[in-house]
Swiss-Prot record:
Enzyme class: translocase
Tagged with keyword Cytoplasm: no
Name assigned to this protein: Tetrahydromethanopterin S-methyltransferase subunit A
Organism: Methanococcus aeolicus (strain ATCC BAA-1280 / DSM 17508 / OCM 812 / Nankai-3)
Gene this chain is encoded by: mtrA
Signal sequence extent: none
Key words, A-Z: Cell membrane, Cobalt, Membrane, Methanogenesis, Methyltransferase, One-carbon metabolism, Transferase, Translocase, Transmembrane, Transmembrane helix
Similarity comment: Belongs to the MtrA family.
Gene Ontology, cellular component aspect: plasma membrane
InterPro entries: MeTrfase_MtrA/MtxA, MtrA
Main location as per UniProt: membrane
The protein's role, per its UniProt record: Part of a complex that catalyzes the formation of methyl-coenzyme M and tetrahydromethanopterin from coenzyme M and methyl-tetrahydromethanopterin. This is an energy-conserving, sodium-ion translocating step.
HAMAP family: MtrA (MF_01093)
Catalysed reactions, as listed in the record: 5-methyl-5,6,7,8-tetrahydromethanopterin + coenzyme M + 2 Na(+)(in) = 5,6,7,8-tetrahydromethanopterin + methyl-coenzyme M + 2 Na(+)(out)
Length: 240
């Protein structure tokens, strides 16, 4: 049997709308923008399961709960991707690349992928503690999710060798999922999409203006060519 450790007192240390299972399980599940998958994940053996909507504070809260429980060695990212925030891809980028000096998640494609409270030490712990992030983004089939959880459990390497690490988040609260009405105010998905569409419309207007300018020049050049041709024809006939 794999060796286990006690998680931090009161784990999960950050409150939220997640469901908690066996704290000695090696698997934690994030269901991104989907709901209704958590009970199935817990029944399959996950330690914790819940949604995560934002690529900044939401990710920090997930990290805080994971690194405070050394038994968690696998992260299963599933459920529908969050439009605009692209949280699932941001989790993968965080695990693979970490953060820069400015707190930005390297390679993340979300709207505001910056971690203000989780520093290099916490992210390094997150990367080292996890053996693997299992990518089931946009999968909502509870059968596939349960099967993936059980597969991870069969490969349980035991608890991470270091003690629980406590990440202090300003304003408290929790999301793995959680209430996000704290100091960081991420952009709503609708706002991000609206801005993207406005940029696209602006680009199309610019393209249309260029086409109109080209057509206008072409038309004017064509008229000038006809006029010159008529003038030369008259000149030739007058010389005959």
């Amino acid at each position: 049997m794999a060796d286990k450790k006690a998680p931090a007192s009161g784990w999960p240390i950050v409150s939220g709308e997640y469901v908690v299972g066996n704290p000695e399980s090696c698997v934690a599940v994030v269901t991104l923008g989907s709901h209704g998958l958590d009970e199935a994940a817990i029944e399959a053996g996950a330690a914790i399961s819940g949604p995560c909507h934002t690529e900044n504070l939401g990710i920090e809260k997930v990290v805080a709960n994971y690194i405070s429980n050394p038994n968690i060695r696998f992260m299963l990212v599933t459920g529908s991707e969050v439009q605009g925030h692209i949280t699932g891809q941001c989790f993968k980028a965080l695990y693979e690349n970490g953060i820069g000096d400015d707190g930005g998640i390297i390679g993340a494609k979300g709207a505001i992928p910056f971690l203000e409270n989780a520093g290099q030490d916490a992210i390094s712990r997150f990367q080292n503690q996890l053996v693997e992030i299992v990518d089931l983004i946009d999968v909502e089939d509870t059968g596939k999710i349960s099967s993936a959880i059980k597969d991870c459990i069969s490969k349980d390497p035991g608890a991470f060798e270091e003690d629980p690490m406590i990440l202090d988040l300003e304003g408290g609260g929790g999301e793995a999922g959680a209430d996000e009405s704290t100091s960081i105010k991420p952009a709503a998905p609708e706002t991000v999409l609206l801005e993207a569409r406005m940029r696209m419309i602006s680009e199309k207007i610019n393209d249309a203006a260029l086409i109109a300018k080209f057509n206008s020049g072409y038309y004017n050049g064509k008229i000038q060519g006809i006029a010159i041709g008529l003038f030369l024809s008259l000149l030739i006939f007058s010389l005959l």
